[in-house]
Amino acid sequence: MHLRNIAVGLSAFFLLATGAHARGVMDLYSSQEQRLSFDACADIFPASTPINTATVPASMKPLALCSDHFAVVYSQTSKTPLVVVERLNARQLNAAKGEERTNHFYADPRLPKGGRAELSDYHGQQPAMDRGHQSPAADAPDAKAMAQSFALSNMVPQDPTNNRKIWSKVEADVRKFAVRAGGDVYVFTGPLFDPGHSTIGDNQVWVPTRLFKLVYDASSQRAWAYVLPNAETRIQKPMDYDTFVKSTGLKLLGNLPVSGSVGRS
């Protein structure tokens, strides 16, 4: 009898703690950011023109998510972001240098259960998969932005070596470029799912076969991109925008002017 009472008490405490955590995580987002639209973050996109989620196949069940410093086109089918957009500049990245990484990952409370990844999906996987940031934690200029970057809606299952070495180098190169660019640089990052891709976890989170990062310098109208396997690989020479579109089928810059490319810095 006493053991049962203890068990019931612990269960109630767990439920209360879980509810408090969910409320606390939701507090990271403004009322506008909780509305699942790009109204609160249109200025993160080039020319303040967000990606139209209606252009995403309906089978992917897309949603629009705003955070303070990045925007996400999210799929309830893959349980991953499809595209994450950032607007980077020297001021933001210089502020980010002093921000401490938290490593507090969490399921995005704005998303319906069954349409999102859970922490348990990444546990005990063979082969192991990292929770790979699409908007890097190192880009976050303040504590709130850092916390938001650890939402699973900003993650894809990523090969550990790729995440910690190859992709980390790509991210660092983009930051160096953005600091020197003298204006706003827009970065589009996301997964590519080729036929035969695998899944992880009870929620069947899709594992990308490739990853992309497209950089657009609004001042010079130059664009360049990486498209790399989600595996231990080497950094390849960046491609121009036309090659990126042909490789991925993604015309992410719409009708924005693109006048050239640029290599790694």
Each PLM stretch: what is its role?
Residues R4-N5, F13-S265:
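Domain-level detector for secreted/extracellular nuclease and nuclease-toxin modules, and
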